[in-house]
């Protein structure tokens, strides 16, 4: 789920996966967004952040959030989801030091933002989570943007997941899926309802047609097992000098596929309630908890402390654990 590792190196150069864009990116200091306001993953710096990140004379300037194409795509889709879900989402209650955070006591090489909106009582929504990370590394930077919308136990409908992992100006990893909540081999009717009837696989086929696309496989076998057979798990590599091509693909084919997948989820999953036997519901809840706990273990506890330090990482992970409804290990 929340992938906090750099993408695999591009085939053209061992270091290209972490090379910094040669194009001049727009730099966005973090901004705490108003509770209940429209989706924002970047903007003007609040006074609190300015105070915490002020560098002494001669000190290294604090890292700022870089505005890349996939963050704009994520903001647009988050706004679409919020507009559609409306009052089914409660205002954000994420504390300020988790809504915006950075490494090194304010002048480090990594910055991030996290926003979580819980589902209102009586809705099918468990939570909607948005996160954005920018980490400077020796040969460049890594930028990760995530949008998760998870459903609660009133329905067995799939969750929505979108994640972009960019470690190079010419390459990106994209993860897009309706995450299944049942063993698909044991429930062919589940495949038919949410994956065949919705024709969701057409989006994967379109992305796979890109000559720059190749399959992406997580190093974790468990993580691989959680995705559906229609998941878009692709690495897009545009090669040397392909910055403009990658941006066109992100704003074009990837944005189109992500919007189509979200629309399918909003139309076919978000409002669907399910009649289930108690044992069946308990098994689904258990499966959800295992997937959530394992994703935190694999992707967060092993990587976030290295990027932000233990104190910041502990605060952020605790907030995500709260959203996921899992206990600290």
UniProtKB/Swiss-Prot annotation:
Residues 1-11 have a biased composition (Pro residues). Red chlorophyll catabolite binds at residues 163, 216-218, 299. Residues 12-28, 46-59 have a biased composition (Low complexity). Pathway: Porphyrin-containing compound metabolism; chlorophyll degradation. Expressed in leaves. Expressed at low levels in roots, stems, panicles and seeds. GO terms for molecular function: red chlorophyll catabolite reductase activity. Residues 1-61 are annotated as: Disordered. It is an enzyme of class 1 (oxidoreductase). The keyword NADP does not apply. Coiled coil: none annotated. It catalyses: primary fluorescent chlorophyll catabolite + 2 oxidized [2Fe-2S]-[ferredoxin] = red chlorophyll catabolite + 2 reduced [2Fe-2S]-[ferredoxin] + 3 H(+). Keywords: Chlorophyll catabolism, Chloroplast, Oxidoreductase, Plastid, Transit peptide. InterPro entries: RCC_reductase. It is found in: Plastid, Chloroplast. Induction: Induced by wounding and senescence in leaves. One of its GO terms (biological process) is chlorophyll catabolic process. GO terms for cellular component: chloroplast. Its EC number is 1.3.7.12. Residues 1-50 form a transit peptide. Pfam families: RCC_reductase (PF06405). Catalyzes the key reaction of chlorophyll catabolism, porphyrin macrocycle cleavage of pheophorbide a (pheide a) to a primary fluorescent catabolite (pFCC). Works in a two-step reaction with pheophorbide a oxygenase (PaO) by reducing the C20/C1 double bond of the intermediate, RCC. Belongs to the chlorophyll catabolic enzymes (CCEs). May play a role in senescence and response to wounding. Plants silencing RCCR1 exhibit lesion-mimic spots on leaves. This is Red chlorophyll catabolite reductase 1, chloroplastic. The gene is RCCR1.
């Amino acid at each position: 789920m929340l992938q906090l590792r750099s993408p695999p190196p591009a085939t053209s150069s061992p270091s290209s996966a972490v090379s910094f864009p040669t194009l001049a990116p727009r730099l966005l200091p973090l901004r705490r967004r108003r509770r209940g306001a429209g989706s924002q993953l970047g903007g003007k710096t609040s006074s609190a952040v300015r105070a915490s990140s002020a560098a002494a004379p001669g000190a290294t300037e604090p890292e700022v959030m870089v505005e890349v194409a996939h963050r704009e795509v994520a903001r647009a889709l988050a706004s679409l989801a919020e507009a559609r879900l409306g009052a089914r989402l409660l205002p954000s209650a994420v504390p300020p030091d988790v809504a915006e955070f950075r490494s090194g006591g304010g002048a480090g090489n990594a910055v991030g933002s996290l926003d979580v909106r819980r589902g209102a009582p009586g809705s099918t929504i468990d939570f909607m989570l948005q996160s954005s990370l920018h980490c400077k590394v020796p040969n460049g930077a890594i930028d990760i943007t995530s949008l998760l919308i998870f459903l609660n136990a009133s329905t067995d409908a799939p969750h929505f997941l979108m994640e972009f992992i960019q470690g190079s100006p010419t390459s990106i990893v994209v993860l897009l899926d309706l995450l299944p909540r049942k063993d698909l081999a044991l429930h062919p009717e589940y495949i038919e309802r949410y994956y065949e009837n919705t024709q969701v696989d057409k989006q994967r086929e379109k992305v796979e047609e890109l000559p720059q696309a190749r399959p992406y496989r997580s190093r974790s076998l468990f993580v691989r097992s959680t995705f559906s057979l229609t998941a878009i798990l692709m690495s897009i590599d545009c090669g040397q000098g392909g910055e403009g091509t990658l941006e066109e693909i992100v704003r074009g084919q990837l944005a189109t596929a992500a919007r189509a997948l979200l629309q399918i989820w909003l139309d076919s999953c978000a409002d669907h309630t399910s009649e289930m036997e108690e044992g069946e519901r308990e098994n689904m809840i258990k499966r959800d908890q295992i997937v959530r706990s394992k994703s935190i273990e694999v992707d967060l506890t092993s990587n976030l402390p290295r990027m932000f330090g233990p104190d910041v990482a502990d605060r952020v992970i605790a907030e995500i654990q709260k959203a996921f409804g899992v206990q600290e290990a």
